[in-house]
Amino acid sequence: MSDDEELEKIRRRQMEELQRQAMQRQMAEEEEKQREIEKARRQQILRQILDPSARERLNNVRLVRPDLADNVENQLIQLASMGRINRIIKESDIIDILSKLTENKREPKIERRSK
């Protein structure tokens, strides 16, 4: 095999690697774009069905329990998309929903025994 052929193989491999990396970057950018679109759609729905104090309450819950806030948001968005929410949700409604979701949950108690 001549030096020219080896050099051409190396160039071809490098070009393929660069193309593969560019493709991966493009796919990652597309996925990020889709996540942003979905996030904007969710925020728009929540702005339509929640009053400002309810949104603030949910954001405060998100600081402490992001999983609980996501759960409440998902339920509200699902109900709104099914047409089952026919009024603006107030802060007191959010408090009721949160209390119902957390009343049966018991936090595990960790005891540390020293010798």
From Swiss-Prot:
GO terms assigned for molecular function = DNA binding
Key word Flavoprotein present: no
Segments spanning the bilayer are: none
Q: Which Gene3D superfamilies match?
A: PDCD5-like
Q: Which GO terms describe its cellular component?
A: cytosol
**Where are the residues of the annotated region Disordered?**
18-37
**Which keywords does this Swiss-Prot/TrEMBL entry list?**
DNA-binding
Q: Which family does it belong to?
A: Belongs to the PDCD5 family.
What name does this protein carry?
DNA-binding protein TV0008
Upper classification of the organism: Archaea, Methanobacteriati, Thermoplasmatota, Thermoplasmata, Thermoplasmatales
